[in-house]
């Protein structure tokens, strides 16, 4: 048994310009090879493009997109008696936001287009409207959980 105490849960810091935790979570997920300044550049350009496209507050569009993509329930592989079942589990808010951000970035990376800022802004605007690959991924996850509802007692 470990003698160390339980680690304190770190609170998510907010970014320097918008003072927003979601923006910081997005920056930390888009980060590659430790190039944080480049990640900030991409996010801020995407936010400016959202401002130009929608002519509304870009942070509210970001919040709306993440809220739209955040799943309520997901499936987890659980091995029972030699066979693996997809067991539906409820997801907490932090984990749901993390999944939503991961799906948004994955969908924007797959998009054809000029640069990452443009692709990310397009995906965020689409997600806020209720369309796009990330929304489809959420719906697919919900369908999967609904289909495997019979295994919910394996939790």
Curated annotation (Swiss-Prot):
GO BP annotations, alphabetical order: translation
InterPro entries linked: Ribosomal_uS7, Ribosomal_uS7_bac/org-type, Ribosomal_uS7_CS, Ribosomal_uS7_dom, Ribosomal_uS7_dom_sf
GO molecular function terms listed in the Swiss-Prot or TrEMBL record: rRNA binding; structural constituent of ribosome
CDD domains: uS7_Chloroplast
Keyword Plastid assigned: yes
Subcellular location: Plastid, Chloroplast
PROSITE patterns recorded: RIBOSOMAL_S7
Family recorded in the similarity comment: Belongs to the universal ribosomal protein uS7 family.
HAMAP family per the UniProt record, alphabetical: Ribosomal_uS7_B
Subunit and partners: Part of the 30S ribosomal subunit.
Name of the protein in its database record: Small ribosomal subunit protein uS7cz/uS7cy
Organism annotation: Buxus microphylla
Gene: rps7-A
């Amino acid at each position: 048994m470990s003698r160390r105490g339980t680690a304190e849960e770190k609170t998510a810091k907010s970014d320097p310009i918008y003072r927003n935790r979601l923006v910081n979570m997005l920056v930390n997920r888009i980060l590659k090879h430790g190039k944080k300044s480049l990640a900030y550049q991409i996010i801020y350009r995407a936010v400016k493009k959202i401002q130009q496209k929608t002519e509304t507050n870009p942070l509210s569009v970001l919040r709306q997109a993440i809220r739209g993509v955040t799943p309520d329930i997901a499936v987890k592989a659980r091995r029972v008696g030699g066979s693996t079942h997809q067991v539906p589990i409820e997801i907490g808010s932090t984990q749901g936001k993390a999944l939503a951000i991961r799906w948004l970035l994955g969908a924007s990376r797959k998009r054809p287009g000029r640069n990452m800022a443009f692709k990310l802004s397009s995906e965020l605007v689409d997600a806020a409207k209720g369309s796009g690959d990330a929304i489809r991924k959420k719906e697919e996850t919900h369908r999967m959980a609904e289909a495997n509802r019979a295994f919910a007692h394996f939790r």
